[in-house]
Amino acid sequence: MNLPAANPRSEPRSGSHGDSRLRAIAEAVESSQRVSFEDGLYLDEHADLLFLGQLANTVRERKNGNLAFYNTNVHLNPTNVCVYRCVFCAFRSDLKAERAYTFDEEMIRERVSEATEAGATEIHVVGGLHHQKPFEWYVDVVRVIHDANPRIHIKAWTGVEINWFAHISKKPVEWVLEQLIDAGLGSMPGGGAEIFDEEIRGRICEHKADGQSWLDIHRCAHQLGLRTNATMLYGHLE
């Protein structure tokens, strides 16, 4: 569906509420100038959501016009057994709990087959950190998916999971990522970011990789050519 194009010369400034600096930032965006770090902070502190959305839409339309893009994504969660006990998580399970499960290779292939038949263009893989599984098992999950359908994009393992893999393999993060890329990894999901504030993170997931580790892992992934997402978790302490 084609929507009427926004007027980039008037809409963003309409939400500036007389703020001359916001108007100047909007004019810079409209002129295809890069916003500085300081201007970004000012937007965060002083601009309302609609104003930010209007600026973002100006950039989006410049890049993509009125086209929208999407993929068909299917989740694969190979195990719910997890060594961590994040207070907000309803997914995890203890190893001997009745609800615990772990996929074998046949089950993974079946899931990929279902995704392929449904027209999926991407498999999104996240799961528990199974303390009895070696790093090679997690690599094999990616390898089996890629073998079952070499054309499907594999977005797998969050920064927290990569941190765990480095721990159990006793190898650097870069080496861990290289093994996964060789197996077929195409990008990383943004889970595990949660909230970077140390106090809040310590209360909701104190044993999970800290915010700086998460950022360092994603930075390493970018240096290796992987694209990554980032998520924010809310609905807990606030």
PLM region descriptions:
Residues 1-75, 79-83:
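Flexible, acidic/Gly-rich N-terminal and inter-domain linker regions that tether
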Residues 120-230, 234-237:
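Conserved SAM/AdoMet-binding glycine-rich loop
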Residues 51-96, 100-126, 188:
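N-terminal pre-triad scaffold of radical SAM enzymes
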Residues 27-34, 45, 58-65, 91, ...:
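Generic secondary-structure signature for well-ordered alpha-helical cores
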Residues 18, 22, 49-53, 101, ...:
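Generic structural signal for well-ordered, non-membrane alpha-helical segments
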